[in-house]
Amino acid sequence: MQAYQREFIRFAIERGVLRFGEFTLKSGRTSPYFFNAGLFDSGLALARLGRFYASALVGSGIAFDVLFGPAYKGIPLAAATAVALAEHHGLDLPWCFNRKEAKDHGEGGSLVGAPLSGRVLIVDDVITAGTAIREVMQIIQGQGARAAGVLIALNRQERGQGALSAIQEVERDFAMPVVSIASLSDVLEYLAEDAQLKRHLSAVEAYRAQYGI
């Protein structure tokens, strides 16, 4: 685990974004942890989050031309990542997002910001079922662009109904990488090192053993 990943997990816990206990997921599974990126809900939190996204993206080495934030949650994430890339990595790159509903006046259309062209890097919080990414792929392909990869905050490393995780299915179906700031493996490592949080380690390990990839 790299230093920025450890810092990200600590930050997520401090903000209440990453919590431990007993949570019922949409899938019906009872999880010993819960991740809600919507709680990065202040200016300072979003700025720090953007720096973590930028660090993961630069570290991945993925080549891309434009950042894309899927409506709605991906919009501030793509913006924050673009700002962090410019301010902390000297990379001034274009970014854009889509509207859920196309406008019929003004600039019109369903896309806002830079042109969606070339190699597109998708920025989102998590990939749960992969449905949202499949919708985004239609938008990208409709513009004659191609997806370079996906950048998310946390990889749960959890299989869906089959043997693969939603992330693995996206990587397989679209032949592109999915990069995360941190993964469940990193969370487990963090728990093992933290005296106060170590009590949650066995429950998360058991969940990983049952549903992990």
From Swiss-Prot:
Cofactor(s) listed in the protein's UniProt record: Mg(2+)
Swiss-Prot/TrEMBL catalytic activity: orotidine 5'-phosphate + diphosphate = orotate + 5-phospho-alpha-D-ribose 1-diphosphate
GO biological process, one term: 'de novo' pyrimidine nucleobase biosynthetic process
Top EC category: transferase
Entry keyword set: Glycosyltransferase, Magnesium, Pyrimidine biosynthesis, Transferase
Entry's Gene Ontology molecular function annotations: magnesium ion binding; orotate phosphoribosyltransferase activity
GO cellular component, one term: cytoplasm
Catalytic activity, EC: 2.4.2.10
Binding of 5-phospho-alpha-D-ribose 1-diphosphate, residues: 26, 72-73, 99-100, 103, 105, 124-132
Family under the similarity heading: Belongs to the purine/pyrimidine phosphoribosyltransferase family. PyrE subfamily.
Function per UniProt: Catalyzes the transfer of a ribosyl phosphate group from 5-phosphoribose 1-diphosphate to orotate, leading to the formation of orotidine monophosphate (OMP).
Protein name per the record: Orotate phosphoribosyltransferase
